[in-house]
C-alpha cells in the first residue's frame, strides 16, 4: 500500500467523498487518537490452527454423517457443496474480513452501521445459549473417557435389574440370533431401542450400551412436567473439570489459546485416521460406507434437504455466532486471510466426509455383527449417536476395545474443547472490548464460573430435554436470522462497493466477481428463502419422539424472541442516544458509519482515509448497468446508505 507519501485528511469516509474534511485541520477525531495496542497472534499459523479447531469439531464427526444420511445420503453432498460455495464460504470470508479490518469483536465491529449493533448483542446471546449446553456434552464425553479405563467397558454388559437387555458383546447377540430372535423391521422400532421379533410378537429389547446411557449416565426422565431433577454428582464433577480446562486454555487470551490450537486442531486428525484405518478393515464396513454414500436423488427436490444443508454449514463452520470475527480481530492488519478462509472451509468439508466414512464403516460392522440387513436400524441421531451407537460398536471390537474407546472419546473431548474455547473467547472479547480496563483473565474466570453454573441444568435427569429446547430456539434460529441481518448491514446498508474498497485497501487485491455476486444476491436471497421456509414448516419439537409440554414451547419461543429482539431494540437505543433532530433522522443517521469505523491503528487509518477519498471520484463516474445492482442500491439508499 504505497500511500505513505500522501498527506492524510481527517474524517470517516463513506465512500462518496463526504468523509473527507479539511486536510489542514490538526484536530483528531476519537477514532484517530492513539489506542491501546491489541494483542496479536504469535504467528499466522496460530490463527489458522484456531480457525480449524473451531470449524472442524463435533459437527463433522457426529452431526454431519447422520444429517447426510437422513437427507439423501450421497445426494446430500450436492446441495451441501452448493450451499458451501454460495453461503458458507462467502459468510466465512466476510466475517474474517470484518474482524481483521477493525481489530474489534462481534459488537464493536458495528461502528460500520451503528444501528445494527443489536446484531452483535443478539449473536452474543445465541453464543451464550450454545455454550451453556455444549459444555454438558464435554461432561458426558469426559465421563465415558474415564470409565473406558476399566478392565471391561461398563456399557458392554447388562445389569441384573435391566429387563429385556442384550449385552453389547458380539457373542451375546449371536446367542440371541441362534435362539430364533430376529430383528424387527423399521416399523417395529421405537424410542426405547432396538425392536426384536420373537414368536410372531414384538419384544422390545435394548442393548446394554443404550440402557447404560439412559439409566446409569443421564438417568433419563421421560416427563419434565414436574421438573428436570437434581444434577448428577459424577456429571457435575466432569462438567467442572471441563470448565477448568476451558479456563486454562483461554486465561491469557490468544497467547495461551494460540499455543493450544496446534494440539486442538491436529490431534483429532491423528485419532480420526487411526479409527478410519481400523473401521475400514472391519467386516461389514464396505456396506456401511456404501449405505452412507449411496445417493437418493429424489431428495434433491425436497426443500428440507436444502434447509438442513444450510443449518449443517452454519453449525460446522461456526459462522453467525462470532468466533470467526473474534479470531480474525487478533490478526495483523495485513494478514493474508483469503488463503486461510479457503483452507479452513475446504478442510472442513473434507473432514466431514472423512468422519462420515469412518462412522458408517463402524455402523456397518455393527449391523454385520447383529445380522441386520438395514443399517438404518443401528443409526441414531444427536447424543444417541455419540453415546449409544459408537460405544456399542466399539465394545464389539475383538482387540483392545478399551484403547479405541479412550482414543475415540478423547478425540471428541478435544474437538469439543476447540469449539467451546472459541465460543467462550468470543464472549470474553466482547466484554473486554466494552470495558477496556478489565483484566482478561478475570473476565475469563468469571464467565467460566457462569458457564459452569448454567451447565448444571443439563446434567440433570431432564437435561437432554433442556438441551434440545435451547439448541432449537436459542441456538439455531437466533444465529440464522441474525446472520441475515449481519450480511444485510454490510452489503446493503454500508454498501457492497464500500466494503470491497476496504478489502482492496487491507488485502491489496481487487475483490472478484464471485464474492460480489454472492454477497449481494445469492447468499442473502438463499438465506432469506430458507429462513421463511423453515418458519412456515416449523413443527413442535420432540425429544425421543415425545412432544414437549406447552409451557416448554412457550419458554422456547420466548428464548428466540429475546435473541432476535436484540437487533431492533439496540438500534432504537442507539438512535435515541445520538439525536439528529427528528427521531426519523436519528434512525437514518444510525445507518451511516460512525467516526470509529475503520482500521484501529491511527497511521493505517489515515492511509485508509486517503485511499477512500481517492476512490470516491472514480465511483462517482461509474455507472452500474446491472438491474440487480440498481435494485440493491435503491434499497440501500432508502435505508440511509451513502453508497
Curated annotation (Swiss-Prot):
Q: Which UniProt keywords apply?
A: Amino-acid transport, Glycoprotein, Ion transport, Membrane, Sodium, Sodium transport, Symport, Transmembrane, Transmembrane helix, Transport
Q: Does the keyword Transmembrane apply?
A: yes
A GO MF label:
L-amino acid transmembrane transporter activity
Record's compositionally biased regions (Low complexity): 8-26
Q: Which SUPFAM superfamilies match?
A: SNF-like
Q: How does it sit in the membrane?
A: Multi-pass membrane protein
Among Pfam families, the record links this protein to: SNF
Query: What InterPro entries does its record include?
Result: Na/ntran_symport, SNS_sf
Which residues lie toward the Cytoplasmic compartment? 1-40
Q: What subcellular locations does the record give?
A: Membrane
Write out the ranges of the annotated region (Disordered): 1-38
Q: Does the keyword Glycoprotein apply?
A: yes
The family classification in the record reads: Belongs to the sodium:neurotransmitter symporter (SNF) (TC 2.A.22) family.
Q: What is this protein called?
A: Sodium-dependent nutrient amino acid transporter 1
Q: Which organism is it from?
A: Drosophila simulans (Fruit fly)
- Whichever gene encodes this chain, its name is NAAT1
Amino acid at each position: 500500500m504505497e500511500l505513505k507519501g500522501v498527506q492524510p485528511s481527517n474524517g470517516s469516509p463513506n465512500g462518496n467523498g463526504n468523509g473527507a474534511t479539511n486536510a489542514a485541520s490538526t484536530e483528531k477525531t476519537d477514532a484517530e487518537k492513539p489506542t491501546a495496542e491489541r494483542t496479536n497472534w504469535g504467528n499466522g499459523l496460530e490463527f489458522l490452527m484456531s480457525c480449524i479447531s473451531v470449524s472442524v469439531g463435533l459437527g463433522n464427526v457426529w452431526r454431519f454423517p447422520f444429517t447426510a444420511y437422513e437427507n439423501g445420503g450421497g445426494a446430500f453432498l450436492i446441495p451441501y457443496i452448493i450451499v458451501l460455495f454460495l453461503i458458507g464460504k462467502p459468510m466465512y470470508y466476510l466475517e474474517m474480513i470484518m474482524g481483521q479490518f477493525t481489530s474489534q469483536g462481534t459488537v464493536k465491529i458495528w461502528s460500520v452501521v451503528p444501528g445494527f449493533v443489536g446484531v452483535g448483542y443478539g449473536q452474543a446471546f445465541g453464543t451464550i445459549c450454545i455454550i451453556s449446553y455444549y459444555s454438558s456434552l464435554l461432561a458426558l464425553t469426559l465421563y465415558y473417557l474415564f470409565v473406558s479405563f476399566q478392565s471391561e467397558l461398563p456399557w458392554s454388559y447388562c445389569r441384573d435389574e435391566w429387563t429385556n437387555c442384550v449385552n453389547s458383546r458380539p457373542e451375546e447377540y449371536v446367542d440371541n440370533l441362534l435362539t430364533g430372535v430376529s430383528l424387527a423391521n423399521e416399523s417395529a422400532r421405537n424410542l426405547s431401542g432396538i425392536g426384536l421379533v420373537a414368536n410372531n410378537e414384538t419384544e422390545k429389547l435394548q442393548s446394554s450400551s443404550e440402557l447404560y446411557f439412559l439409566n446409569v449416565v443421564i438417568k433419563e426422565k421421560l416427563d419434565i412436567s414436574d421438573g428436570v431433577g437434581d444434577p448428577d454428582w459424577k456429571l457435575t464433577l466432569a462438567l467442572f473439570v471441563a470448565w477448568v480446562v476451558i479456563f486454562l486454555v483461554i486465561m491469557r487470551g490468544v497467547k495461551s489459546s494460540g499455543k493450544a490450537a496446534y494440539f486442538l486442531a491436529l490431534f483429532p486428525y491423528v485419532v480420526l485416521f487411526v479409527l478410519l484405518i481400523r473401521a475400514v478393515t472391519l467386516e461389514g464396513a464396505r456396506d456401511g460406507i456404501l449405505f452412507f454414500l449411496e445417493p437418493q436423488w429424489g431428495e434433491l427436490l425436497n426443500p428440507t434437504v436444502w434447509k438442513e444443508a444450510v443449518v449443517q454449514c452454519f453449525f460446522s463452520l461456526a459462522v453467525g455466532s462470532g468466533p470467526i470475527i473474534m479470531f480474525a480481530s487478533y490478526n495483523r492488519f495485513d494478514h493474508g486471510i483469503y488463503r486461510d478462509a479457503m483452507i479452513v472451509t475446504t478442510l472442513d468439508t473434507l473432514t466431514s466426509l472423512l468422519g462420515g466414512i469412518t462412522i458408517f464403516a463402524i455402523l456397518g460392522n455393527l449391523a454385520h455383527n447383529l445380522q441386520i440387513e438395514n443399517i438404518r436400524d443401528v443409526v441414531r441421531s444427536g447424543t444417541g449417536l455419540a453415546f449409544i451407537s459408537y460405544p456399542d460398536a466399539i465394545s464389539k471390537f475383538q482387540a483392545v476395545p478399551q484403547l479405541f474407546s479412550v482414543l475415540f472419546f478423547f478425540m471428541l473431548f478435544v474437538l469439543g474443547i476447540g469449539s467451546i474455547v472459541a465460543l467462550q473467547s468470543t464472549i470474553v472479547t466482547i466484554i473486554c472490548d466494552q470495558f477496556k480496563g478489565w483484566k482478561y483473565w478475570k473476565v475469563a474466570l468469571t464467565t467460566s464460573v457462569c458457564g459452569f453454573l448454567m451447565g448444571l441444568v443439563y446434567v440433570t435427569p431432564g437435561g437432554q430435554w433442556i438441551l434440545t429446547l435451547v439448541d432449537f430456539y436459542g441456538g439455531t434460529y437466533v444465529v440464522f436470522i441474525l446472520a441475515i441481518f449481519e450480511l444485510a448491514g454490510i452489503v446493503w446498508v454500508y454498501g457492497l462497493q464500500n466494503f470491497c474498497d476496504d478489502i482492496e485497501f487491507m488485502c491489496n487485491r481487487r475483490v472478484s466477481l464471485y464474492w460480489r455476486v454472492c454477497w449481494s444476491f445469492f447468499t442473502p436471497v438463499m438465506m432469506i428463502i430458507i429462513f421463511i421456509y423453515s418458519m412456515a414448516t416449523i413443527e413442535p419439537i420432540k425429544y425421543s419422539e415425545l412432544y414437549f409440554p406447552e409451557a416448554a414451547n412457550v419458554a422456547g419461543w420466548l428464548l428466540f424472541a429475546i435473541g432476535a429482539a436484540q437487533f431492533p431494540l439496540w438500534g432504537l437505543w442507539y438512535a435515541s442516544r445520538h439525536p439528529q433532530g427528528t427521531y426519523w433522522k436519528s434512525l437514518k443517521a444510525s445507518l451511516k458509519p460512525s467516526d470509529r469505523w475503520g482500521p484501529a491503528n491511527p497511521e493505517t487509518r489515515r492511509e485508509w482515509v486517503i485511499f477512500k477519498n481517492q476512490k470516491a471520484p472514480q465511483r462517482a463516474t461509474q455507472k452500474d448497468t446491472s438491474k440487480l445492482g440498481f435494485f440493491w442500491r435503491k434499497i440501500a439508499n432508502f435505508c440511509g446508505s451513502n453508497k
